Amino acid sequence: MATDCHCTDESETMTEMLSQPGSLALHPDRLLPADPAVRDIARRLYTAVRDLPIISPHGHVNPAILLDNVPFRDPAELFVTPDHYVTRLMHATGVPLDALGVGQGPLSETAARATWRLLCTHWDLYRGTPVRYWLESELVEIFGVTTRPSAVSADAIYDHLAAQLSQDAYKPRALFDRFKISVLATTDDPCDDLAVHAALAGDPTWTGRVIPTFRPDRYLEVPEPGWPAAVARLGEVCGQDTSGYRGWVAAMEGRRQYFISHGAVSADHAHTDCGTEPLESSEADRIYGAALAGTATPTEAVALRRHMLLEMARMSTQDGLTMTLHVGVRRGHHQPSAARFGPDTGHDIPLRGDFTDPLRPLLERYGTHPNLKLVLFTLDETVFSRELAPLAGFYPSVYVGQPWWFLDAPDAIRRWRAAITETVGFTRTSGFIDDTRAFCTIPARHDMSRRLDSGHLANLVAEHRLDEGEALETAVDLVSGRPQEVFGL
């Protein structure tokens, strides 16, 4: 009987302990190798790159936050609502997206607090995920939070964050400087007038560098709703008659030049596949006319898009914009969610990758052209060593893009580095790409990459495959040299 009482007491004590919020702290050796000897090397390498400026050549931060420089509205707006990395896992466990403020615009204080409570209540969902790593880094390093999020601690943390967000030191421009961002690229529609970028560039109180990226996807995807109106608008913006194929091409060329005049260094393309089969000019003109009339078949629409992607590579050889390909995603996999909440709200799913044959027409024409830089991104790990590394290991124009989206996680990044390095080394890679909409995750994401690369290089030193001086040079080059070269920064 006494034993039963003792077990009951222990159970009650454990329940009480679990009900109390734990402390939140970051281990200085997080993500570094577990072996002490290798870890010592990694520490030295990481120390050398830890505080280097951040180069972010591809991402989705809204530049208006830096122009307006108004305080972030609330913790939910900053940490939860716009970040599908955060919302999708809660949705998978039964939390409706509308309960997280998705697609609702600015939230009331009551609604924002309720959204924040949901994140804290579901904190255990993120164990072992990169989202947990980024969020903890933000909370501790930027905002000084010392209590682990939970249902019990949610309101206290919310109040702490809200108080800090009201201070000048936590406005977007102050954080931009604090994060040591040297270049931040946004992603922009070809019809955008880039007025925000121009206003930032002309602001004498602003010393940062924010540049646009040309993203023409919607103008190449004939089946998308509103495509005829979109290409008509494209023509209006640049003074071209887009009622014919040649005018459509000329409009794209004109807008690319406009973007370049506002600082753009790259054009980003995200399609289901990376096919680049050429069409005869007469056939392209015929299909384009059918597309405007609404009579193009699905096969014709794909053929026109693949031909135009080849044309985009041709344009890059002429205007110098780095061409990045993010392919292999089924967008809007759950149509009801896509219709209700819009794109980029968590319902996109990866597809198998295929690069070798689909890119052959492009690479046979332009793969050795001195002006083309082509960065390939995939969500299919099986092509890292089978296709991407061999392509980048032959064609001077091709670079292997950093793991992206579902793969920008510690173990996936380690697998990527191991899969490609023996074929292409380090110099045929893009440098780290954060690709984020969540502004405050930028330093956490780049720090994660620097730690992982330091660990990988430390292993090579420990195995006597590199000396430490070479490893140090490589660590610095991955942070600074690679993105500067690949994106012409």
Indicate where each model-derived feature is located.
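Short, basic/hydrophobic alpha-helical segments
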Residues: 361-366
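Divalent-cation-assisted or electrostatically stabilized phosphate/pyrophosphate-binding catalytic cores
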Residues: 353-356
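C-terminal amphipathic alpha-helical interaction region
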Residues: 323-325
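Cysteine-centered motifs
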Residues: 5-7
